Each structure stands twice: as structure tokens, then as C-alpha cells.
Amino acid sequence: MRNEMNLQFSALSQNESFARVTVAAFIAQLDPTMEELTEIKTVVSEAVTNAIIHGYEGNAEGIVYISVILEEAMVKLTIRDEGIGIFNLDEARQPLFTTKPELERSGMGFTIMENFMDEVEVISNESFGTTIHLTKYLSNSNALCN
């Protein structure tokens, strides 16, 4: 059985934890392992932070959109912004690359996403924003949403 959730919120840094906890609560019905849940929460944090800091460049008027689809033991996340987009996507996906070197922990977001998720697709258009599609196959889900 398929179950879906959609969420949107202002591009404020304090909403990053809200997004992480909300997505985790929704995914909990699949009974993921603690490691899987932690990885998904981390990926949500990274993608939302990228949207806020890089996509909207701190402009709180922007909106971050999250869609979560649960099917059997599969979690599909889509995190989207309508910000400035990514100028050079290949370069941005390189470990330690950042356009904001003054920020702590910069340059690891895409690397973390690629290590924790089974599939990562990034679509970005300058001036139109970025959409990140992420898929995770849970190892031993007792899918409660059936």
C-alpha cells in the first residue's frame, strides 16, 4: 500500500529540525532500523539546509517543499526549492566543494546524501530552483502501512 505526505514551510533555519522530525515520524510506520532512520533524518537536514542557505541564500520568504512516499519497504523523498538553482551541478556534487567556505561543515551535503541513500537525483535550473529525489530501500521493514 502506498502512503504519501506533503509538507511546505518557510526557508528559516529553525524549520530544519521541524522537517527532520516530521519526516522521521511519518517514516516510523515502516519500522526502520535506528541506523536507517538516523540516515534519513540526516539527509533531510542536509537537503533542507542546502535549500535555505544556498537556494534561497537566507531569504526567509522562500518556501521549502518536501514530499515523502512510502511503498512497502521503500522511502522516496523529494525536497525542492524555488531558489537560485545550482550554477555547476557536477562541481557542487564534489566532496568539500562549497560556495560558502565561511560556514561550518560546508561542502559535504551531497556526499552525505549519496552515502546514506540508495538513489540520488538532483535537478537544478538557475533562477528556477533545485529538486532532489532520494530513495532508500529499508532492510527489514515491517511495513505497518499495509
From Swiss-Prot:
Alphabetic keyword roster: ATP-binding, Kinase, Nucleotide-binding, Serine/threonine-protein kinase, Sporulation, Transferase
Gene3D superfamilies for the chain: Histidine kinase-like ATPase, C-terminal domain
Annotated GO MF terms: ATP binding; protein serine kinase activity; protein serine/threonine kinase activity; sigma factor antagonist activity
Catalytic activity: L-seryl-[protein] + ATP = O-phospho-L-seryl-[protein] + ADP + H(+); L-threonyl-[protein] + ATP = O-phospho-L-threonyl-[protein] + ADP + H(+)
Listed EC numbers: 2.7.11.1
Enzyme class: transferase
InterPro entries: Anti-sigma-factor_SerPK, Anti-sigma_F, HATPase_C_sf
Pfam families the record matches: HATPase_c_2
Functional description taken from the UniProt entry: Binds to sigma F and blocks its ability to form an RNA polymerase holoenzyme (E-sigma F). Phosphorylates SpoIIAA on a serine residue. This phosphorylation may enable SpoIIAA to act as an anti-anti-sigma factor that counteracts SpoIIAB and thus releases sigma F from inhibition.
Family: Belongs to the anti-sigma-factor family.
Name the UniProt record assigns to this protein: Anti-sigma F factor
Organism of this sequence: Bacillus cereus (strain B4264)
Gene name linked to the record: spoIIAB
